[in-house]
Amino acid sequence: MDSLFIIISLVIVILTTIFILSNLLSKKTILLPGKTGLPLIGESIDYFNKLRTGINEKFVMERKLKYASDVFKTSILGENMAFLTGPEGNKFLFSNENKLVQVWWPSSVDSIIKKSHNKSAQAESAKVRVLLPPFLRAHAIKHYVSTMDSELRQHVADFWVGRDEVEVCPLVRKYTFALAVRLFLSVRDPGELEALARPFEEAAGGIIAIPINFPGTRFNRGIKASQRIRKVIGGIIEQRRKDLSEGKATPSQDLLSHMIVEVDRRNAENPDIAPATDSDISSDILGLLIGGYDTINTTIVFVMMTLVEYPDVYDQVLKEQREIAASKAPGELLNWDDLGKMKYSWNVACEVLRLRPPTVGAFRVAKTDFNYGGYTIPKGWKLHYIPHFTQKNPDYFPNPEKFDPSRFAGDGPAPYTFVPFGGGPRMCPGNEYARAEILVFMHNIILRYNWEKLIPNEKVVIDPLPRPSQGLPIRLIPHKA
């Protein structure tokens, strides 16, 4: 009996030990290196401090070195969050979109871009993206180039010609917003344009604000501004439906017509699903306008700032643009083939995008538990990548603070190291649109002007995207005929 008791006891001890060890090993794979910091606050203070000083890549590098790991945990915006670093991490996130991870946005996005059926903006984003290819892919952008050029020529005539000095930031915002509204909504009426433009910046600012909805806060102002914009767009949709029914508008004339027709078709084909409404279309249009607004504005502004700081680069861009202009008849508008010849100009823009990424990066959420780097990322955890980490990393871009457009000549950077537009299925659907608009702007301004900064040492502030603190006032120096 005693020996049986001893055997049973040993078996229990062995099984218990195995259970404890296996549990510990399991936890070891779940518990990522890193810390989540204070409750609710987490490590948000350090993250945003580095973001505002333009060194948010150091937030990643410090922890990567501290934990000797390519993956670590933290807590930002009150969320448990994993960082997958380097090109390998970028590739993993991009290639597993809609498999292991899916898009996630902070709650501020849902508050600004509100849907009628209370579904989150990220839950709807995939549906919206299905509607975009006919209008934002390369084959469609080909037809926009001449319109972009025509609109910009008129903008320059209205706001640049005859002026000795201009402030770049507000002029770039005015042009890019007016162009987007023209192409997406066919809006040209100055009254409608002003009704959309006036509250737009507050709505865009609310997206990236701390989500505290008290009167007077940036977030609260953003919500109210978005409501005003959606009301204006709602009126445009109502009139467009009438025009479509009377044959005064066509389903293919712009993004709005296409979305109306496509949404109506899907509602009819899926009667058991809550139908999308005109309010949803309005929110989707608002989201698209906001989505591309800062990317293009930031890049154009810093191209302008950079070219004045590097005269040799300016001279090479001017030479390239003059060669293109010389190949065209007087008054002839730019076309898609012309943009393909602007190789050095685009290398310059890419180097600006590398040094001044016009985004803080992107967020994902784990759809299921998955393994990465020997650790398990739990379902529901958020993931974050920032382009700054690879784009300003000397391992991938030697002497990373040096402005050097030649980095993008030939084969260019290694895969997944230059990611200003994301990658994989979530590649920014407007990247070709942004490329075209940036190059058309460079062509028109550089052919007409050189310039000098009125504030030579104007600081760059980041809130949370980079911008010249005083709006980049410049003195225009027209080229001699």
Swiss-Prot record:
Annotated keywords: Heme, Iron, Membrane, Metal-binding, Monooxygenase, Oxidoreductase, Transmembrane, Transmembrane helix
Gene Ontology MF: a single term: iron ion binding
Catalytic reaction equation(s): beta-amyrin + reduced [NADPH--hemoprotein reductase] + O2 = maniladiol + oxidized [NADPH--hemoprotein reductase] + H2O + H(+); oleanolate + reduced [NADPH--hemoprotein reductase] + O2 = cochalate + oxidized [NADPH--hemoprotein reductase] + H2O + H(+)
Disulphide bridges, residue numbers: none
Domain of life: Eukaryota
A biological process term (GO) from this entry: biosynthetic process
E.C. number(s) listed in UniProt: 1.14.14.63
Alphabetical list of CDD domains matching this protein: CYP90-like
Topology relative to the membrane: Single-pass membrane protein
Keyword Ligase on entry: no
Compartment(s) of residence: Membrane
Entry comment describing in which tissues the protein is expressed: Highly expressed in roots. Expressed at very low levels in leaves and petals.
Record-listed heme binding positions: 428
Parts of the chain that traverse the membrane: 4-24
Family: Belongs to the cytochrome P450 family.
Primary role: Involved in triterpenoid saponin biosynthesis in roots. Is also able to oxidize oleanolat to cochalate.
PANTHER family (UniProt xref): BETA-AMYRIN 28-OXIDASE, CYTOCHROME P450 26
Protein name: Beta-amyrin 16-beta-monooxygenase
Protein's organism: Platycodon grandiflorus
Origin organism lineage: Eukaryota, Viridiplantae, Streptophyta, Embryophyta, Tracheophyta
Encoding gene per record: CYP716A141
